[in-house]
């Protein structure tokens, strides 16, 4: 009787095939720990700069609380990369680490999707989605670069291996071809996300960003071996579904009640919306996002919505926006051309829009309840953020000092806001106090007789597609250097003028032209008061061009003062 031949079973996969599964779970656990730590940081952390601590320590504390990308991404990736190189040889088992790069990029997507939820109910009390915009930008870039490196390294590995056919590996195998498609899409996204490209055509970037993200989430499970369907695909699809639901459930139709744009030399406009579109209460400085398309229109999902800071308070009868429209004017042209750009987004009375939702500002709760020594500094259309804050603190009896400084290029911008105050019956005279005041600084010259007849000579194009807020490139021309901030004793040949041109608020609002502006001089009383009160009672708000934000932030760091800013950017 013949013995049956010995049958040898060969493993389909090498011993390293499943080496990265546990690492993927580890990344997911680190993401969860980071979220818990972030919630605790915002709930119990201290953003207040201690007067007894060094400037360096205060800076680190502030950057940590403020979700600075460099600090937070450094902490996150330090934890994630600790076990990245472990057990397997980098020279003889390099495939393990190349695959690990791919799994790392996909395992980080749930965290990225979670932090961009609008609203984010887990972090809603102590965070807003705008807090995560800088973090999201850099986190997304790192994720895409890691995924792209995974693909590039495998292509190089196959290309230099004489025993491997690159065509067979890359094209003829479905799972690898799916990965190749992902790499091409990710590369295109990275090109579109470069600053100049993104600013030149934000709509293109936004469309590519969303489509590539969806493709990355859905194609990676086809490409990945071992699979990533559970839990990663399930988590990613669930979070995507929540994003979609948020844009459906909270959205509502709206029409413009009124639009005031009848001014001779500014593209600053006042838009009035129905009060019913928002809940009974919203915090001062909140903002809304508006889409020109209905929810059933595919463009509602493909194109970006437009954010606008609410200039009203919750008790007002309407929702008011003070915004700047996109400029296409050449020097010396008429103001009507400011609103003729077909690429821009304008709110018109005859159209129906979709309000996606309203969102709270990035202002700590203790500021509203404890603040008694307040300074607000804004530039251009940043007045939409500053004005409701000023009104909120002006109406509080316990506020000891309140000053708002508004830097603008032209008197016509002030006229529009003044008209807005008159139209809404807003007068500050009934609670007049020497410690409550508005100062308006105008960088250009004007006289009361000729200011309305002058034609603007320096209007830059703006991009209305900014990720947050109604401040835009138009205001970037409002440089602090135009106000001689670097030299308080500058001997300018242009005479300074200072007067209060209104009857209703004549003693309250002071308008200054060609006035030497220095933050320290304007805030002497504010700084003196800060030494007399509890540290949690002193707050400085800033909203405007980068130079203004940097100046305000430096002032607060030097003086150990709480700082809140509204930042806009693509």
From Swiss-Prot:
<feature type="transmembrane region" description="Helical">
    <location>
        <begin position="21"/>
        <end position="41"/>
    </location>
</feature>
<keyword id="KW-0472">Membrane</keyword>
<keyword id="KW-0249">Electron transport</keyword>
<feature type="transmembrane region" description="Helical">
    <location>
        <begin position="142"/>
        <end position="162"/>
    </location>
</feature>
<feature type="topological domain" description="Cytoplasmic">
    <location>
        <begin position="42"/>
        <end position="69"/>
    </location>
</feature>
<dbReference type="GO" id="GO:0097038">
    <property type="term" value="C:perinuclear endoplasmic reticulum"/>
</dbReference>
<feature type="transmembrane region" description="Helical">
    <location>
        <begin position="374"/>
        <end position="394"/>
    </location>
</feature>
<feature type="topological domain" description="Extracellular">
    <location>
        <begin position="198"/>
        <end position="373"/>
    </location>
</feature>
<comment type="function">
    <text>Probable cell surface metalloreductase. May be involved in iron or copper homeostasis.</text>
</comment>
<dbReference type="InterPro" id="IPR013130">
    <property type="entry name" value="Fe3_Rdtase_TM_dom"/>
</dbReference>
<dbReference type="Pfam" id="PF08030">
    <property type="entry name" value="NAD_binding_6"/>
</dbReference>
<dbReference type="InterPro" id="IPR013121">
    <property type="entry name" value="Fe_red_NAD-bd_6"/>
</dbReference>
<feature type="compositionally biased region" description="Polar residues">
    <location>
        <begin position="480"/>
        <end position="505"/>
    </location>
</feature>
<comment type="similarity">
    <text>Belongs to the ferric reductase (FRE) family. AIM14 subfamily.</text>
</comment>
<keyword id="KW-0274">FAD</keyword>
<feature type="domain" description="FAD-binding FR-type">
    <location>
        <begin position="250"/>
        <end position="388"/>
    </location>
</feature>
<keyword id="KW-1133">Transmembrane helix</keyword>
<feature type="topological domain" description="Extracellular">
    <location>
        <begin position="1"/>
        <end position="20"/>
    </location>
</feature>
<dbReference type="Pfam" id="PF01794">
    <property type="entry name" value="Ferric_reduct"/>
</dbReference>
<dbReference type="GO" id="GO:0006915">
    <property type="term" value="P:apoptotic process"/>
</dbReference>
<keyword id="KW-0813">Transport</keyword>
<dbReference type="Pfam" id="PF08022">
    <property type="entry name" value="FAD_binding_8"/>
</dbReference>
<protein>
    <recommendedName>
        <fullName>Probable metalloreductase AIM14</fullName>
        <ecNumber>1.16.1.-</ecNumber>
    </recommendedName>
</protein>
<keyword id="KW-0406">Ion transport</keyword>
<keyword id="KW-0521">NADP</keyword>
<dbReference type="InterPro" id="IPR013112">
    <property type="entry name" value="FAD-bd_8"/>
</dbReference>
<feature type="topological domain" description="Cytoplasmic">
    <location>
        <begin position="163"/>
        <end position="176"/>
    </location>
</feature>
<feature type="transmembrane region" description="Helical">
    <location>
        <begin position="70"/>
        <end position="90"/>
    </location>
</feature>
<comment type="subunit">
    <text>Interacts with ribosomes.</text>
</comment>
<feature type="region of interest" description="Disordered">
    <location>
        <begin position="480"/>
        <end position="509"/>
    </location>
</feature>
<feature type="topological domain" description="Extracellular">
    <location>
        <begin position="91"/>
        <end position="141"/>
    </location>
</feature>
<dbReference type="GO" id="GO:0033215">
    <property type="term" value="P:reductive iron assimilation"/>
</dbReference>
<dbReference type="GO" id="GO:0005886">
    <property type="term" value="C:plasma membrane"/>
</dbReference>
<feature type="domain" description="Ferric oxidoreductase">
    <location>
        <begin position="101"/>
        <end position="219"/>
    </location>
</feature>
<dbReference type="GO" id="GO:0000293">
    <property type="term" value="F:ferric-chelate reductase activity"/>
</dbReference>
<dbReference type="GO" id="GO:0032956">
    <property type="term" value="P:regulation of actin cytoskeleton organization"/>
</dbReference>
<dbReference type="InterPro" id="IPR039261">
    <property type="entry name" value="FNR_nucleotide-bd"/>
</dbReference>
<dbReference type="GO" id="GO:0016175">
    <property type="term" value="F:superoxide-generating NAD(P)H oxidase activity"/>
</dbReference>
<feature type="transmembrane region" description="Helical">
    <location>
        <begin position="177"/>
        <end position="197"/>
    </location>
</feature>
<keyword id="KW-0812">Transmembrane</keyword>
<dbReference type="InterPro" id="IPR050369">
    <property type="entry name" value="RBOH/FRE"/>
</dbReference>
<feature type="topological domain" description="Cytoplasmic">
    <location>
        <begin position="395"/>
        <end position="570"/>
    </location>
</feature>
């Amino acid at each position: 009787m013949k013995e049956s031949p010995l049958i040898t079973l060969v493993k389909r996969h090498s011993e390293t095939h499943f080496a990265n599964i546990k690492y993927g779970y580890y990344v997911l656990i680190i993401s969860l720990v980071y979220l818990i730590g972030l919630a605790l940081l915002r709930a119990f952390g201290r953003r207040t700069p201690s007067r007894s601590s060094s400037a360096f320590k205060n800076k680190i504390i502030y950057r940590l609380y403020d979700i600075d990308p460099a600090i937070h991404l450094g902490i996150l990736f330090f934890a994630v990369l600790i076990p990245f190189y472990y057990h397997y040889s980098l020279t003889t088992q390099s495939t393990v680490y190349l695959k690990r790069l791919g799994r790392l990029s996909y395992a980080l997507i749930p965290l990225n999707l979670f932090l961009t939820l609008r609203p984010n109910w887990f972090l809603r009390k102590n965070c807003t989605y705008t807090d995560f915009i800088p973090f999201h930008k850099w986190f997304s870039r790192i994720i895409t670069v890691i995924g792209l490196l995974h693909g590039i390294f495998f292509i190089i590995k196959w290309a230099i291996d004489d025993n491997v056919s690159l065509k067979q590996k890359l094209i003829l195998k479905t799972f690898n071809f799916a990965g190749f498609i992902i790499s091409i899409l990710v590369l295109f996204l990275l090109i579109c996300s470069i600053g100049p490209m993104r600013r030149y055509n934000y709509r293109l970037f936004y469309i590519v960003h969303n489509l590539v993200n969806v493709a990355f989430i859905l194609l990676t499970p086809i490409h990945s071996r071992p699979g990533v369907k559970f839990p990663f695909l399930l988590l990613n699809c669930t979070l995507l579904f929540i994003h979609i639901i948020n844009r459906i459930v909270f959205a509502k139709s709206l029409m413009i009640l009124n639009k005031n744009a009848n001014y001779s030399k500014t593209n600053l406009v006042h838009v009035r919306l129905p009060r019913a579109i928002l809940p009974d209460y919203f915090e001062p400085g909140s903002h809304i996002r508006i889409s020109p398309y209905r929810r059933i229109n595919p463009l509602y999902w493909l194109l970006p919505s437009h954010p606008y800071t609410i200039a009203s308070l919750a008790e007002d009868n309407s929702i008011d926006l003070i915004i700047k429209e996109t400029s296409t004017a050449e020097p010396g042209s008429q103001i009507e051309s400011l609103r003729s750009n077909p690429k821009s987004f304008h709110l018109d009375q005859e159209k129906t829009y979709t309000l996606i939702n309203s969102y709270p500002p990035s202002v700590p709760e203790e500021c509203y309840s404890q603040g008694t020594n307040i300074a607000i500094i804004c530039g251009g259309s940043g007045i939409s953020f500053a004005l409701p804050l000023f009104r909120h603190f002006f109406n509080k009896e316990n506020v000891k000092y309140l000053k708002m400084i508004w830097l603008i290029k032209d008197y016509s911008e002030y006229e529009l806001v003044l008209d807005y105050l008159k139209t809404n019956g807003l007068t500050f005279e009934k609670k007049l106090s020497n410690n409550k005041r508005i100062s308006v600084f105008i960088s250009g010259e004007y006289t009361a007789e000729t200011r309305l007849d002058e034609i603007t000579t320096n209007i830059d194009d703006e991009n209305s597609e900014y990720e947050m807020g109604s401040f835009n490139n138009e205001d970037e021309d409002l440089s602090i250097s135009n106000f001689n901030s670097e030299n308080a004793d500058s001997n300018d040949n242009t005479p300074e003028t200072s007067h209060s041109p209104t009857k209703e608020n004549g003693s309250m609002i002071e308008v200054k032209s060609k006035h030497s502006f220095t933050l320290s001089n304007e805030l002497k009383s504010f700084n003196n008061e800060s030494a007399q009160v509890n540290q949690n009672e002193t707050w400085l708000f800033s909203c405007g061009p980068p130079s203004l934000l940097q100046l305000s932030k430096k002032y607060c760091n030097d003086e150990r003062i709480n700082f809140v800013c509204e930042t806009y950017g693509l």
